[in-house]
Design a protein with these regions (language model features):
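An amphipathic alpha-helix signature
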Residues: 50-54, 138-143, 153, 157
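Walker A (P-loop) phosphate-binding motif
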Residues: 1-37
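N-terminal polybasic phosphate/anion-binding patch
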Residues: 20-23, 31-44, 59, 77, ...
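Small-molecule kinase domains that catalyze NTP-dependent phosphoryl transfer to phosphate-bearing small molecules
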Residues: 97-98, 105, 126-127, 147-196
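ATP-dependent NMP and nucleoside kinases share a basic, alpha-helical "lid"
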Residues: 99-107, 111-147
């Protein structure tokens, strides 16, 4: 048992490999809260949120009470103002839910991780002792996203443009891991991070963010 329990965020731009990194952490039996999943659950199930989204983006935002992902994505990422609007609706609710889930997980775990692409955009960094940034070159990230069929090149570029650049994130993150290599190399970095965090928790060293 660690002297200090730790809340740790894992972030990174689209296609950086943060989800794969978190999968390796989860394989070690550490809880990983996925902010993107929470956001989708809130959008689909929170009546007040749905009403705000429909008011801003129209009735087509939902079909048969289900999220119209294609319509909303086109609406949101076609205009930076719409990104700000949807974030202002979702981020406060996501932050509350993440806080709740972290507290629940810390009852039985020394370290809880949260995977979230928009840690800095949502101003969530002060919720955590440490923020971990996973980075990769823009061309590498683009190839990954297109290869797995998630987005077209144009869709990738639109979403990438609406995220804070890695250069700025690197200045604010506590740990930065490059992910331009193999999956095995990324796994080794995840293992290394866990070892470091256990050491920090054992010595009760907190980040300057929460001291």
């Amino acid at each position: 048992m660690l002297k200090k329990k730790l809340k740790v965020a894992v972030t990174g731009s689209i296609g950086s490999g943060k989800s794969t990194f978190c999968d390796f952490i989860a394989e070690k039996d550490y809880p990983v809260i996925k902010a993107d999943d929470i956001s989708k659950q809130i959008l689909a199930g929170d009546k007040n949120v749905k009403e705000k989204v429909i008011k801003k983006f129209g009735d087509e935002s939902f079909i048969n009470n289900q999220i119209n992902k294609k319509f909303l994505a086109e609406k949101i990422f076609s205009n930076p103002i719409n990104v700000i609007i949807i974030n202002s609706i979702l981020h406060p609710e996501v932050k509350k839910k993440v806080q709740q889930l972290m507290q629940e997980q810390l009852r039985n775990n020394d370290i809880v991780f949260t995977e979230a692409a928009l840690i800095y955009e949502a101003e969530m960094e002060d919720m955590f002792e440490y923020v971990i940034l996973i980075t990769a070159g823009s061309s590498v990230r683009e190839k990954r996203i297109i290869a797995n069929g998630k987005l077209t090149r144009d869709e990738f570029k639109k979403r990438n443009e609406n995220q804070i650049k890695d250069e700025e994130k690197k200045k604010r993150a506590d740990f930065v891991f490059e992910n331009d290599g193999s999956v095995e190399e990324l796994k080794q970095k995840a293992d290394f991070l866990i070892t470091v965090l256990i050491g920090l928790g054992s010595s009760a060293t907190a980040s300057s963010r929460n001291t």
